């Protein structure tokens, strides 16, 4: 995997930086693990925009990724190939189990075709293996961590993502996330050893607006150039400052304003990410 700067043959390619991985499969994905994916364009079931700046983009299938990895314990598996996934920043790996079944999983750092994997409490502590947190040594770097036993991985799934197992006490373990937050998770929750691969993803440079549109992201218009009917910062003659602290189109303070309100899970947070 390497960062490649393109030749300045056009303004769009002048600053473009790509992540090139020659180990990725160049053919079509594994068809039985593909599903149709219909465009939502940031709308809900009423057609109302719930997420702005979404729409368009290239058509692609959804790759069914196994985030649970809990029903193949003790069955050896082999990495058949690594693949690009347009639905996420991390790459995925197609693994074939000894019983012949194939599944997609998130590819960990250093994973290569032909690598042997194992799920379950008896699995060795080796990158790519998945096992309950109660069987993972304290201090181990982990990824794809469950928040509830059997629900599937929810923490540290993006490219280059990881967490660190800090301690175990009773039925709960403490995990430090990349944000600095220390969180309690049940020891029966499962995690994968190692870091998520494709760690250079954050260093790429898109290069041109069109490439962002291919990804289904639409332009972001500043509130200060809108009309007063459209945004609290809008209006004025000529170029005019916002005249107030930055807010969203609905008047909520933005740029650092904390909006988290989930008392149900407050007890699971040992240290907030803001107190690093």
UniProtKB/Swiss-Prot annotation:
Q: Which GO terms describe its biological process?
A: cytoplasmic translation
The family database entries (Pfam families) matched by this protein are listed as: Ribosomal_L2, Ribosomal_L2_C
Q: Which Gene3D superfamilies does the record associate with it?
A: 2.30.30.30, Nucleic acid-binding proteins, Ribosomal protein L2, domain 3
Q: Name one GO cellular component term.
A: large ribosomal subunit
Region spans: Disordered: 225-276
A GO molecular function annotation here is: structural constituent of ribosome
InterPro entries recorded:
NA-bd_OB-fold (IPR012340), Rib_uL2_dom2 (IPR014722), Ribosomal_uL2 (IPR002171), Ribosomal_uL2_bac/org-type (IPR005880), Ribosomal_uL2_C (IPR022669), Ribosomal_uL2_CS (IPR022671), Ribosomal_uL2_dom3 (IPR014726), Ribosomal_uL2_RNA-bd_dom (IPR022666)
Which keywords label this protein?
Ribonucleoprotein, Ribosomal protein, RNA-binding, rRNA-binding
Q: What assembly does the database describe for this protein?
A: Part of the 50S ribosomal subunit. Forms a bridge to the 30S subunit in the 70S ribosome.
Q: What protein family is recorded? A: Belongs to the universal ribosomal protein uL2 family.
- Entry function: One of the primary rRNA binding proteins. Required for association of the 30S and 50S subunits to form the 70S ribosome, for tRNA binding and peptide bond formation. It has been suggested to have peptidyltransferase activity; this is somewhat controversial. Makes several contacts with the 16S rRNA in the 70S ribosome.
The cross-references to HAMAP family, in alphabetical order and at most eight, read: Ribosomal_uL2_B
What protein name does the entry list? Answer: Large ribosomal subunit protein uL2
| Species lineage | Bacteria, Pseudomonadati, Pseudomonadota, Betaproteobacteria, Burkholderiales
């Amino acid at each position: 995997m390497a960062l490649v700067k393109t030749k300045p043959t056009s303004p769009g390619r002048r600053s473009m930086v790509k992540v090139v991985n020659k180990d990725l499969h160049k053919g079509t994905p594994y068809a039985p693990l593909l599903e149709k994916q219909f465009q939502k364009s940031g709308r809900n079931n009423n057609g109302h925009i719930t997420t702005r700046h979404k729409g368009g983009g290239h058509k692609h299938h959804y790759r069914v990724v196994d985030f649970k990895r809990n029903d193949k314990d003790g069955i050896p598996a082999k990495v058949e190939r690594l693949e690009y996934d347009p639905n996420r920043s991390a790459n995925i790996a197609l693994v074939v189990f000894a019983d012949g079944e194939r599944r997609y999983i998130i590819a960990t750092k250093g994973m290569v075709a032909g690598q042997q994997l194992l799920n379950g409490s008896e699995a060795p502590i080796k990158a790519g293996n998945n096992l309950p947190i109660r069987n993972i040594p304290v201090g181990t770097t982990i990824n794809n961590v469950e928040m509830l036993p059997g629900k599937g991985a929810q923490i540290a799934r993006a490219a280059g993502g990881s967490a660190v197992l800090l301690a175990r006490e009773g039925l709960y373990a403490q995990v430090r996330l990349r944000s600095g937050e220390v969180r309690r998770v049940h020891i029966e929750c499962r995690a994968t050893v190692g870091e998520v691969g494709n760690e250079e993803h954050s260093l790429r440079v898109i290069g041109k607006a069109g490439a962002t549109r291919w990804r289904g992201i639409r332009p972001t218009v500043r509130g200060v150039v809108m009309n007063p009917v459209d945004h609290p910062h809008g209006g004025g003659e000529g170029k005019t400052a916002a005249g107030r602290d930055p807010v969203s189109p609905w008047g909520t303070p933005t740029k650092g304003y904390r909006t988290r309100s989930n008392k149900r899970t407050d007890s699971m947070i040992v240290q907030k990410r803001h107190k690093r």
